Amino acid sequence: RQMCIRDSTSPVSPPPFMAGAAEIEVDLETGKITPINYVAAVDCGTVINTNLARIQAEGGLVQGLGMTLYEDMQYTKAGKMKNRNFMSYKIPTRLDMGNIKVEFESSYEETGPFGAKSIGEIVINTPAPAIADAVYNATGLRFRTLPITAEQVLMGLLDKEEA
């Protein structure tokens, strides 16, 4: 059986929209992916406080980039988490992110306060597909699981070489 969702939007709380594009470098000797630029366009209705909205968007993008490239929860057979500290559970630092640029598309949402829509969760969704597509453009390899690690990229490149 599959879990299906019929409708995930509310007529009284329209969703925000976002598009993202990633520019990366892939080291073909090691498989390491380095983010260079990430550009996001966000429609969250009327932006009430641009500085706070930008910080919210940038923070969510960093979380999404971390989920895409670094964060890998590992468990023992008994269900205990193996990587329980920041030495073994990797999260990105500001130095890992490259340049992030966020632009807002202003629209007016009648049901929102002062025409605003939410911005909280939408920004974490675009880094994974944007980076996966950038890796595909750079290597011809398609990844559908996260994180996309240097080891996976290198193994894919070696397999591709042998074929």
Give the predicted meaning of each segment.
Residues 2, 6-163:
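C-terminal catalytic domains of large/alpha subunits in multi-subunit enzymes
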